[in-house]
Amino acid sequence: MSQLSTIIEQAFENRANFTAADCPADIRQAVEEALSGLDNGTLRVAEKIDGEWIVHQWLKKAVLLSFKLNDNKPIESGDLAFYDKVDTKFAGWTEEQFKEAGVRVVPPAVARRGSYQAKNVVLMPSYVNIGAYVDENTMVDTWATVGSCAQIGKNVHLSGGVGIGGVLEPLQANPTIIEDNCFIGARSEIVEGVIVEEGAVISMGVYIGQSTRIYDRETGEIHYGRVPAGSVVVPGSLPSKDGKYSLYAAIIVKKVDAQTRAKTSLNDLLRAD
């Protein structure tokens, strides 16, 4: 793997020196190998090791290089036609392949090649971008979007219209991460590499980026870029220092309890084979 990452890193540094037409074969092969690994889940842009999230920047660079190395081409889907550089993930899949993957894909959900969905993932009419990783038993509900290289944990519910930010444009250093057992309420947006830690519940209509104040009303502490594990978060505001106006903030109102869990529990019937 070190050889693969070295080729990608060097190619990215020298990307101005070649085009899709004259790209060296070893670079093209390395980019394809990286995308295949992202697509089948053997590689991922970020992973938790010894309690810390480690970002493999070289894989993000491989994704960016793939746009340079591939030309746009017509992509057909029934009566619809598209023109893009990235194939859709499930194009040409057989019933056997879907059964083996254990993923349910409701039309017209779209996942790009280079994204991964683990067993018992349900894709309602939604969009999953290249480099994203969606772990087991997670539902991506209607009109939700999972951005490029975003990391979604196990047993997560992304409600209708949720937006999980990507890293490619505007270019971000780290992917947005939703850890295991989280619930993200309808129309909420989590972007700019924010980490929502395990078991957190985000209410409907909460918007969190790196500059968003995340205020814990119990302790008075303000967090940036991280929602602590087990938090229940709602939209709110905090007063300015002079008291003349208020600015948006995300408010931690409590820790998850049995009542919260009952309201946000997953329905196994929707994930049955």
Curated annotation (Swiss-Prot):
Pfam families given in the database record: Hexapep_2 (PF14602), THDPS_N_2 (PF14805)
The reaction(s) this protein catalyses: (S)-2,3,4,5-tetrahydrodipicolinate + succinyl-CoA + H2O = (S)-2-succinylamino-6-oxoheptanedioate + CoA
GO biological process: one example: diaminopimelate biosynthetic process
Superkingdom of this protein's organism: Bacteria
InterPro entries in UniProt: DapD_Trfase_Hexpep_rpt_fam, Hexapep, Hexapep_transf_CS, THP_succinylTrfase_dom1, THP_succinylTrfase_N_sf, Trimer_LpxA-like_sf
GO cellular component, one term: cytoplasm
Record has Transferase as a keyword: yes
UniProt enzyme class: transferase
Keyword Metal-binding: no
Associated pathway: Amino-acid biosynthesis; L-lysine biosynthesis via DAP pathway; LL-2,6-diaminopimelate from (S)-tetrahydrodipicolinate (succinylase route): step 1/3
Subcellular location: Cytoplasm
SUPFAM superfamilies named among the record's database cross-references: Trimeric LpxA-like enzymes
Known partners and oligomeric status: Homotrimer.
Entry-linked HAMAP family: DapD (MF_00811)
Name of the protein described by the UniProt record: 2,3,4,5-tetrahydropyridine-2,6-dicarboxylate N-succinyltransferase
Organism: Acinetobacter baylyi (strain ATCC 33305 / BD413 / ADP1)
